């Protein structure tokens, strides 16, 4: 899977492409699921200007086995940090370092990240919008979640007022570079002014969008508005002895 990320601040506008690849797993998934090839191309026009939720709704309008599907997503944070999903008018208790959840395609989900290493008291509130689904073998959904990594660099950049957009995509095996993957994420920089969603679409199939920075709870804003209505989240225990997918990413 891949992610696309962009930074923007008062004096900084940058777009990156970041990636992590599980070559054998991605090829197996694509070969065993012909529908994936039929989904291309997408052509995301003016995607960067769309408000949160619009891209997921647009994807649902294209049809396919998406509506009502609960897609596993694993959010990963630096060691010691805690991640909590929104629920009701607040947040559930945070889980350390990794949170495995099931999200519907289309809604926007707000999360809270706390206890960031070296940043006592800092809280950040990223959102995740799932725009497509994976097609793993039957009974293997939880072994192959969409991975969303929150790096310390990104968290600190968001805390400084920069806005980060990352698009996680399923890499096209015909474009993949067969490298031995390390635990750290591999990043490819896109040109300034490029839309990370469009870049991700050229390299594979966009799966989810992470947005972070620039939003904290406002006293004049209702809790439900800030939480985008707090759509229900399915929380999973992580499977034992799981082989995680490595996926390329655009940031």
Predicted feature locations:
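A general "mature secreted/periplasmic domain" signal
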Residues: 38-250
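Bacterial N-terminal signal peptides
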Residues: 16-32
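N-terminal secretory signal peptides that target proteins for export/translocation
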Residues: 1-18
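Sec/Tat signal peptide C-region and signal peptidase I cleavage site
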Residues: 33-37
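Short, intrinsically disordered, low-complexity terminal/loop segments
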Residues: 2, 250-251
